[in-house]
């Protein structure tokens, strides 16, 4: 950009921190902005340290380091895999995959749950340490979906394990799952207990 000698060049230092300049940051979405972190960052900027209860600190740490285990049963599992790939990248929200239920905090049930698979789902859920959370992904996992009247389908995985977040769709998009994960993080922050 060529600036005439008599005019002032636009300066980003004239914009106060945290105002309109924030919207120009790549990847910032005001809909996903959390006022909880505004309070912490304001307190940190004023004093140089943060005072909080141990429960608040543990809850804050838990929301940023959730380990999820896949329980992909049908076509929804493909969209679940998309959400972990570079385009959506769930790990940037502190949501990393694990292969074992013993190291997982969250289980994503994606797809049609059959009667034969229901005991395995419950067994895997019981192996997860407390506090544990479950996301039901897709119409089939939520309520039976297209196969509702089949003799071999469980009409919703909430009959087997308690569900925290329902992600609707057939199949739901990867964006819907990312939104469900963000809602789970907000729910954990809101309830904020060490034991569930």
Swiss-Prot record:
<dbReference type="GO" id="GO:0005506">
    <property type="term" value="F:iron ion binding"/>
</dbReference>
<feature type="binding site">
    <location>
        <position position="75"/>
    </location>
    <ligand>
        <name>[4Fe-4S] cluster</name>
    </ligand>
</feature>
<keyword id="KW-0997">Cell inner membrane</keyword>
<comment type="subunit">
    <text>NDH-1 is composed of 14 different subunits. Subunits NuoB, C, D, E, F, and G constitute the peripheral sector of the complex.</text>
</comment>
<comment type="function">
    <text>NDH-1 shuttles electrons from NADH, via FMN and iron-sulfur (Fe-S) centers, to quinones in the respiratory chain. Couples the redox reaction to proton translocation (for every two electrons transferred, four hydrogen ions are translocated across the cytoplasmic membrane), and thus conserves the redox energy in a proton gradient.</text>
</comment>
<dbReference type="GO" id="GO:0048038">
    <property type="term" value="F:quinone binding"/>
</dbReference>
<keyword id="KW-0520">NAD</keyword>
<keyword id="KW-0874">Quinone</keyword>
<dbReference type="InterPro" id="IPR006137">
    <property type="entry name" value="NADH_UbQ_OxRdtase-like_20kDa"/>
</dbReference>
<dbReference type="GO" id="GO:0009060">
    <property type="term" value="P:aerobic respiration"/>
</dbReference>
<keyword id="KW-0479">Metal-binding</keyword>
<dbReference type="GO" id="GO:0005886">
    <property type="term" value="C:plasma membrane"/>
</dbReference>
<dbReference type="InterPro" id="IPR006138">
    <property type="entry name" value="NADH_UQ_OxRdtase_20Kd_su"/>
</dbReference>
<keyword id="KW-0472">Membrane</keyword>
<dbReference type="GO" id="GO:0015990">
    <property type="term" value="P:electron transport coupled proton transport"/>
</dbReference>
<keyword id="KW-1003">Cell membrane</keyword>
<keyword id="KW-0408">Iron</keyword>
<comment type="similarity">
    <text>Belongs to the complex I 20 kDa subunit family.</text>
</comment>
<dbReference type="GO" id="GO:0008137">
    <property type="term" value="F:NADH dehydrogenase (ubiquinone) activity"/>
</dbReference>
<dbReference type="GO" id="GO:0051539">
    <property type="term" value="F:4 iron, 4 sulfur cluster binding"/>
</dbReference>
<feature type="binding site">
    <location>
        <position position="140"/>
    </location>
    <ligand>
        <name>[4Fe-4S] cluster</name>
    </ligand>
</feature>
<dbReference type="GO" id="GO:0050136">
    <property type="term" value="F:NADH:ubiquinone reductase (non-electrogenic) activity"/>
</dbReference>
<protein>
    <recommendedName>
        <fullName>NADH-quinone oxidoreductase subunit B</fullName>
        <ecNumber>7.1.1.-</ecNumber>
    </recommendedName>
</protein>
<keyword id="KW-0411">Iron-sulfur</keyword>
<dbReference type="GO" id="GO:0045271">
    <property type="term" value="C:respiratory chain complex I"/>
</dbReference>
<keyword id="KW-1278">Translocase</keyword>
<feature type="binding site">
    <location>
        <position position="76"/>
    </location>
    <ligand>
        <name>[4Fe-4S] cluster</name>
    </ligand>
</feature>
<keyword id="KW-0004">4Fe-4S</keyword>
<keyword id="KW-0813">Transport</keyword>
<feature type="binding site">
    <location>
        <position position="170"/>
    </location>
    <ligand>
        <name>[4Fe-4S] cluster</name>
    </ligand>
</feature>
<dbReference type="Pfam" id="PF01058">
    <property type="entry name" value="Oxidored_q6"/>
</dbReference>
<keyword id="KW-0830">Ubiquinone</keyword>
């Amino acid at each position: 950009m060529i600036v005439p000698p008599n005019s002032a060049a636009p300066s980003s230092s004239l914009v106060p921190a945290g105002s309109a300049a924030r919207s120009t940051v790549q990847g910032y979405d005001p809909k996903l902005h959390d006022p909880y972190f505004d309070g912490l960052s304001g307190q940190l900027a004023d004093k140089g340290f943060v005072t909080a209860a141990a429960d608040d600190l543990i809850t804050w740490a838990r929301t940023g380091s959730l380990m999820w285990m896949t329980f992909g049963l049908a076509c929804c599992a493909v969209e679940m895999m998309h959400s972990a790939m570079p385009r959506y990248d769930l790990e940037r929200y502190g949501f990393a995959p694990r292969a074992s239920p013993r190291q997982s905090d969250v289980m994503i049930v994606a797809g049609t749950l059959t009667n034969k698979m229901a005991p395995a789902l419950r067994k895997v859920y019981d192996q997860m340490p407390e506090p544990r959370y479950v996301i039901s992904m897709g119409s089939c996992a939520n309520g039976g979906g297209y196969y509702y009247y089949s003799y071999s389908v469980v009409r919703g995985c909430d009959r087997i394990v308690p569900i925290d977040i329902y992600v609707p769709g057939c199949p739901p998009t990867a964006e819907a799952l990312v939104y469900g994960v963000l809602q789970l993080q907000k729910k954990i922050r809101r309830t904020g207990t060490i034991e569930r």
